[in-house]
Amino acid sequence: MDIKYKLASYRICSPEETFEKIQEALKKIETVEIKNIQHLDKVNIPVYYLKRRVVVDGKEGIAIHYGKGANDIQAKVSACMEAIERFSASYDKNKVKEKPDNPINVEDLILPQYADKNVKEWVEGIDIINNETIDVPADAVFYPTSGKLFRGNTNGLASGNNLDEAILHATLEIIERDAWSLADLARKIPTKINPEDAKNPLIHELIEKYEKAGVKIILKDLTSEFEIPVVAAISDDLSKNPLMLCVGVGCHLHPEIAILRALTEVAQSRASQLHGFRRDAKLREEFTSKIPYERLKRIHRKWFEFEGEINIADMPNNARYDLKKDLKFIKDKLSEFGFDKLIYVDLNKVGVDAVRVIIPKMEVYTIDRDRLSRRAFERVKKLYY
């Protein structure tokens, strides 16, 4: 299906249409409140949060989800879709089976040393590279999980206006985290991106908002061997508040969409930190409050330093504006470099397409320091040295 909305995002319909479609789903996930929190930060870039009721271990509680965007409606829909995909990823006993028919090699999931490899619960997925069903551990699908195989995470969870859109965006997130992990392992990240030649006016608009607020943005190129742009946006705040030393990373076939995602991710990181509701924000505040701003910058200096510069026009752009063609390009690239499976599990629970995508052998070090493959350092060497 053709991509129709491509200025602020890359979707088959506008965020206004999406918001209208998901109203029933928002009721089903027990949405309590959807609110704009951009007023908490000086950069004036839209960030929303969605609050919903949850039951954990028989006790009622609240879950918070954040959304980002270059405009108000996009940020609002982003928060809603994240909430829907998280609800959809909750444990579903109807999908679980004890005996796999075609089990994945669990070692390909890059396991921590503490992993219990005696997997007792499996879920059937579809491998769209080899066009076959394949069984994956339940811990790799649902969130939250038992954590016996590895710590639960949301990497590769996505929702969309249709199944292919959800698969595409989940896949791009996995490629993003893989590239980010390799950058984390590298001693230097040498290439800065010059955004002056950006054709998308929203890029200039967002950077101008940061500059007016006294926040310098540095864009770094993290693109790996797949030639799918991965961009990091690093914020250097003149207020020198350690909490505002944030990084946002975006990945997309179109470099300008990758840049937009990175820029809006920084805004979301800042606003959610100031909102301070979630446990991860509180832990980060506790940690960073003990370290002076300039020292934090020195610790993370590879993100600020650079040796060369490229223009956006120099970056690969393989966006086909067609979901099937986009996915085919990605599948071909993955296969070319030895990543021979792209698996998705359909998680649709509330009438909105949601998936968990799993790409075996992809790095997740940036979100789980206990999981690192031997191959990672070879890839870092080729990319950065």
Swiss-Prot record:
Domain (YcaO) ranges: 67-385
Domain of life assignment: Archaea
InterPro entries from the UniProt entry: Methan_mark_1 (IPR017667), YcaO-like_dom (IPR003776)
Designated name of the protein: Uncharacterized protein MJ1094
Organism: Methanocaldococcus jannaschii (strain ATCC 43067 / DSM 2661 / JAL-1 / JCM 10045 / NBRC 100440) (Methanococcus jannaschii)
Taxonomic lineage of the native organism: Archaea, Methanobacteriati, Methanobacteriota, Methanomada group, Methanococci
